A protein has these predicted regions:
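Catalytic cores of nucleotide-sugar-dependent glycosyltransferases that transfer UDP/GDP/TDP-activated
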Residues: 1-291
Length: 291
């Protein structure tokens, strides 16, 4: 932080933004840079925030942090916003012809809900491909995780950690992607990546999934095993083209950049008349639209 602060102080101009992540770990940097630069925390999916200007990954997480920091009945903050993570749609080719498997992509740990995906596919007699970190040992169809969980069954296949083309192919060819996270997910990028590839998502019904998964359109949000099983049986009824187009409309680079544009213009006004600044040339308020 000390070296970074020295370098920034040599180059900064009044009115610059200091965009930081990692929360309170970067507070010493913001303090050292001074008041003529505005510290902005972006991509917040954690709780240890410090800045007065914050961009959260979802409304769900923003509200949770407000409650954690402000008590049971907190006031909102005008310069806190929810702007989702962004994706390059070119990284996620889509396919209307799906394979014979379901996919779980993420850390293999209890709180990620892996057991829900395993049990759902077991009840259906369907293949489940598991990909991600957290596996200690694989012996045949027995998968032992670092955290202690053991998953076993003829319907399971573990393919390790995947990136690039292998990841893209797994996403676009899956019948659906499971994201049955137990904790209140700040964002859950895999759910959006799957939809970018035109693949339905089967998730829990809390956290950011209530914002990213359009129930009955781009996937299903579930509470019980019965609901997870029904969802897995009916994901083929959903339209891959619609799923992909909605993801692009809401989470592509071209979309999210306008949300940041509006937000930084709001902050820039604070160097002038602040909250009371008017813009007679404004033509829309589309930055908060969802498509």
């Amino acid at each position: 932080n000390g070296r970074a602060a020295a370098a920034i102080n040599e180059r900064k101009q009044k009115g610059d933004f200091l965009c930081v992540i990692c929360g309170r770990l970067n507070k010493p940097l913001a303090d050292a840079v001074g008041r003529d630069v505005m510290p902005v925390e972006y991509g917040i999916g954690y709780t240890g925030t410090f800045s007065n200007y914050r961009v959260f990954e979802s409304y769900s997480h923003m509200h949770m942090v407000w409650a954690a920091q402000g008590g049971f009945d907190p006031d909102g903050k005008f310069y806190d916003v929810a702007i989702p993570n962004y994706f390059d749609s070119g990284d996620y080719p889509s396919s209307t012809e799906k394979g014979d498997y379901f996919l779980y992509l993420g850390r293999l740990m209890k709180r990620k809900g892996v057991a829900v995906a395993v049990e759902t596919c077991k009840r259906l007699g369907a293949k489940l491909i598991l990909a991600g970190q957290g596996v200690k040992e694989v012996k045949g169809n027995r998968i032992e995780c670092v955290a202690g969980e053991v998953f076993e069954g003829d319907h399971l296949e573990y393919v390790g950690c995947v990136v690039g083309q292998q990841k893209a192919d797994l996403l676009r060819n899956a019948r659906a992607v499971f994201t049955p996270t137990f904790y209140v997910e700040p964002f859950g990028g895999v759910a959006v990546e799957a939809q970018m590839a035109g693949t339905p998502v089967i998730s829990t019904d809390f956290g950011a999934f209530t914002e990213t998964v359009e129930h009955g359109k781009t996937g299903f949000r579930c509470h019980t095993l019965d609901q997870f099983v029904w969802a897995a049986k009916h994901v083929g009824d959903l339209d891959p083209w619609y799923i992909r187009q909605r993801a692009i409309a809401n989470y592509s680079l071209g979309r999210v950049r306008w949300m940041y544009q509006e937000y930084f213009e709001m902050l820039h006004d604070l160097w002038g008349q602040g909250w009371y600044e008017l813009h007679d040339d404004r033509t829309n308020l589309n930055w908060l639209c969802r498509y």
